[in-house]
């Protein structure tokens, strides 16, 4: 086996790239990057009834959006079926596997007999020492591995530790069906060996498969890759992750306005940590990650924590970089396509200028769309219910004075100049600053919350600001 680390991510294209699969891909990718190795991608599309091209495209799109690139071309497991058959037949020639010729009815009777005795349903090995010459006419044979019947099969797992499986519990399982198609258990081993995979990192729901796959490795005389079975993700209530907990495709998280780097940061910390470090860059994660540091216990998914991490990433990101990501994500966000359709160089510059204030109040890009909506609004500005309460008759009277003070401003129209003018007006009129700033905010944005009102004035510019205020006092 190569000294260079080779990991692989091997999803089944029967649906979207769900959040658990994304974390598995991330751990494989991080470990490969951390060790200077490579991560391969294999599409396990042997289930022809459920595998779809649309699901494959969704998985590739999800990985690309997250920035989890793979090395080389994606491999189709289905297209490697001839190689899987070749290895199964080689095992028969080596005496490590054999043909069995039971009919479905015979297999069901075997299972019923085991259940009647209170035993788990297992194949009884009746064709283990017989030859194909004894095969009944018209029955196609399946190939079964000759599993060891004594001792233990040991899986040396870097997360779960040493896991022992009594060989008496491993029956002679099928590796090639009677129709000539390989089983998943067999195809995975052949593919991992041929692709040079040195480290298998996957969910711990595959742990029981590891023993049977080890039997195939040993039968072929192949090195068994290092195995790491990571804990599954549960909901915040400790129950198995479901859609109500967040078991969604990564495209749903893009539509909810999460940054790829923030989502990766959050997923990395589901089962792994680095001291007290909570907010991590991709560079940090690559530098610090080691699969041996992953916990055994199930991790709990918490949307509130994800939002907090996403907000932290937005605030620490350079404004120009955040703007680029925001614009690229607009087609996927609620209200985003309409905003994207109105983008031009002028309001892009306004948006960039407003970002320092906007990102302080937003935890997601969806909230950023909502916060930035005032920049794209057309006059007369729609005013929401809370903002309307700030525009009563007394407030409109104060607005008239504020409009006059701002209109009298000479020189550059800046946040500092606007603030000085409004403060002077408030002081001269005996008003508290908030009594002036709140109706100003409502008039300028149509909302009761926004970035600092003086920043809003600066971003909108003199002409638009004065016009919006005038709309509320005329």
Curated annotation (Swiss-Prot):
Alphabetized CDD domains for the sequence: GluRS_core (cd00808)
Keywords assigned: Aminoacyl-tRNA synthetase, ATP-binding, Cytoplasm, Ligase, Nucleotide-binding, Protein biosynthesis
Organism superkingdom: Bacteria
Q: What is its EC number?
A: 6.1.1.17
Top EC group: ligase
Residues holding ATP: 243
User: Which InterPro entries does this chain map to?
Assistant: aa-tRNA-synth_I_cd-bd, aa-tRNA-synth_I_codon-bd_sub2, aa-tRNA-synth_I_CS, aa_tRNA-synth_I_cd-bd_sf, Glu-tRNA-ligase_bac/mito, Glu/Gln-tRNA-synth, Glu/Gln-tRNA-synth_Ib_cat-dom, GluQ/Sye
GO term, biological process aspect, one? glutamyl-tRNA aminoacylation
Which reactions are catalysed by this chain?
Answer: tRNA(Glu) + L-glutamate + ATP = L-glutamyl-tRNA(Glu) + AMP + diphosphate
Name the Gene Ontology molecular function terms of this record: ATP binding; glutamate-tRNA ligase activity; tRNA binding; zinc ion binding
Q: Which Pfam families match?
A: Anticodon_2, tRNA-synt_1c
Write down any Gene Ontology CC term: cytosol
Query: What exactly does this protein do?
Result: Catalyzes the attachment of glutamate to tRNA(Glu) in a two-step reaction: glutamate is first activated by ATP to form Glu-AMP and then transferred to the acceptor end of tRNA(Glu).
Q: Where is this motif: 'KMSKS' region?
A: 240-244
Assembly and partners are described as:
Monomer.
Motif 'HIGH' region extends across: 11-21
Taxonomic placement = Bacteria, Pseudomonadati, Pseudomonadota, Alphaproteobacteria, Hyphomicrobiales
The family assignment reads: Belongs to the class-I aminoacyl-tRNA synthetase family. Glutamate--tRNA ligase type 1 subfamily.
Q: What is this protein called?
A: Glutamate--tRNA ligase 1
Name its cellular compartments.
Answer: Cytoplasm
